[in-house]
Amino acid sequence: MVLSREYPNWFFTCVSLVALDIGSHWLQMYAQLLRNKSSHKDVDESSFFILRLYYTNRIFMGACCVGAEVLYLAAHAATDPRIMAIAGPLAGALPAKVSLPLPAAPGFGTELSVECASALGQLALVALPFWAVKQAANVAQLVTSCEALVAHDFPKRKRA
């Protein structure tokens, strides 16, 4: 939520990511509870590949979680120009800035950019793929949890 204050153009993106993380985990825990599973990290073979990889390989899951947090911390630290002035070890090998244009929508940023010359920007570039996998796992978790809840509830409603 701190990032939504520091980057007002990204307010809805920041809030949506928090809602996705909390909502997908809550639904996963609730769905697993209804299935009498011992943990929300128990996944079936029929689950999405990304969820199986995420929950069966704890090192991979840890790397994704740490990568996501590092990216958020880097975005927070990037608001300080003194930190952004620290050159990274690959400053000459990378382009000065990498930008990805995004579709325009109110409350959402229109460009994702990273200053690659700074050490912080290079750290963010390393963390970005892990963050992306964690978000993909959250979406997959949300979908599978909703499907499981419907599968659990549908027979009861059909009988009623």
Name the predicted role of every residue range.
Residues M1-L33:
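Multi-pass membrane catalytic core of lipid/isoprenoid biosynthesis enzymes
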Residues Q32-A160:
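C-terminal membrane-associated helical module and adjoining short loops/tails
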